[in-house]
Amino acid sequence: MKLLAVRRLLRIQRVVIRYRLDDLILELPMLPWWLRLLGATLPWRWLPRRKLELTRGARLRLALQDLGPIFIKFGQILSTRRDLLPDDIANELAWLQDKVPPFPPELAVKRIEEQLGAKIEQVFARFEREPLASASVAQVHAARLKSGEEVVVKVIRPNLEPVIRSDIAWLFILARLAERVSSEARRLHPVEVVSDYEKTIVDELDLLREAANASQLRRNFEGSPLLYVPQVYWDWCRPKVLVMERIYGIPVTDLETLRDQRTDFKALAERGVEIFFTQVFRDSFFHADMHPGNIFVSTRAPWSPQYIAVDCGIVGSLTDEDQDYLARNLIAFFKRDYRKVAQLHIDSGWVPAETKVNDFEAAIRTVCEPIFEKPLKDISFGQVLLRLFQTARRFNMEIQPQLVLLQKTLLNIEGLGRQLYPELDLWATAQPFLERWMRERVSPKQLLRNFQQQVEQVPHLSQMARDTLERLSQPHAHNTPPPEWKGSRHDWLGRLVGAVLLVGAAEVGLGQQLEAWPAWVMLAGGVFLILRR
């Protein structure tokens, strides 16, 4: 392992020198003066250099490609963090292609047989040794099950884990070094960025997780004309092998073929937007890797086109609170109610509770008002979220991984939609959906469902209330809310009153099965104050 780490370090050094990435590093404004001076004395900086007619973004992209699959994937993920990167670098990194030569079919067969505990001929009536596709983490082969179904078999590359551990270890070293030497770097949380990447890549190595994600997404859109997700064949799925239904569709970027079959491009673009908002707000479970390589269009009914989604290795989800705040943020933003946008960020706990609303509102207005100089149909939803996140970061907004995934997915969907149909008015498509969803949140049916859920939490809330009151009664207790009660001081003080009411209800009525009417009143008031948003 140590030998591998040293070899990787030497490899990284060679690539840095070849593409003169040291020039880019020394140009960083966050670099302290003494480190800039030390960097200028590096031995290779005194040697003759060949002229590179490349932008800084192109040099970084080529360097990551030379460093191999793990760095390529890191660059792809980094390209989605436009709240951290300059636009020119983020745009260049978005061109990184996760395509590598396939590994020998003999190794694929061996790994499949090890995982399934059976010979390939015992499971498949036909197995194509030439892979359909090959990427940094896995490759895919076509096959037919003994029972006759046409399938694809995805298999993780052999001997990948040691390389991943070594590369991630070096990324952590670089991230910690950056945090140690620069306060500006600390603001960008490089260690958290690498941790997020580590979780993503580790999750992608577990194909059972991907199978479960695909099954959930398929169930959510069962019978839907919007989206089809291939069936998972669980009997033949293992941690390193995934067997799914083989689908036949047109790549969403193959505009010529889609045009030849008379696809309704306007409907196709609008359905992409509808799929996104349905996943986020109806299901709170969304495919977070919807780049063009993972999306196809069914050849059936081109006048009413249906998407096909594959590769569910990366998914995201939102809590009820995040859904609510996100919807209200978007609606408030498009109404130019910057005060409400600022207050919602504070109430949600996305920025510190002590943030001054007036200052935050002014910062949001300064960044976002120019966006509205464009016609509404030309405004990018993804850019709206991006600008909000960039502004909030200046006010110490903590990284919200689920929101980063959401923004990345929205940018993908939006870019794809406008490629299919340039006149796509995303707001006109999304606004009715968001407003309908907000109305349904307060419908009698939904309120009844919420009340039933709240009643189930009463025993837990009563205990939490007791714990909180006991904590606050301690002589040296800090006047801070429990971590479960994130939000503004006004919110948690209200919840504290709710805690007192709950304990009172427990004392007055719970012992007599709530026969005393005051217990009912205190119980209802306590539940409302604690659970309200």
UniProtKB/Swiss-Prot annotation:
Its EC number is 2.7.-.-. It comes from the Bacteria. It is a multi-pass membrane protein. It is found in: Cell inner membrane. The keyword Nucleotide-binding applies. GO terms for molecular function: ATP binding; protein kinase activity. GO terms for cellular component: plasma membrane. ATP binds at residues 132-140, 154. Residues 126-494 form the Protein kinase domain. Pathway: Cofactor biosynthesis; ubiquinone biosynthesis [regulation]. The chain crosses the membrane at residues 24-44, 510-530. Keywords: ATP-binding, Cell inner membrane, Cell membrane, Kinase, Membrane, Nucleotide-binding, Transferase, Transmembrane, Transmembrane helix, Ubiquinone biosynthesis. InterPro entries: ABC1_dom (IPR004147), Kinase-like_dom_sf (IPR011009), UbiB (IPR010232), UbiB_bact (IPR045308), UbiB_kinase (IPR050154). The keyword Transferase applies. One of its GO terms (biological process) is ubiquinone biosynthetic process. The active site is at residue 289. Is probably a protein kinase regulator of UbiI activity which is involved in aerobic coenzyme Q (ubiquinone) biosynthesis. NCBIfam families: PRK04750.1 (NF003404), UbiB (TIGR01982). Belongs to the ABC1 family. UbiB subfamily. This is Probable protein kinase UbiB. It comes from Pseudomonas aeruginosa (strain LESB58). The gene is ubiB.
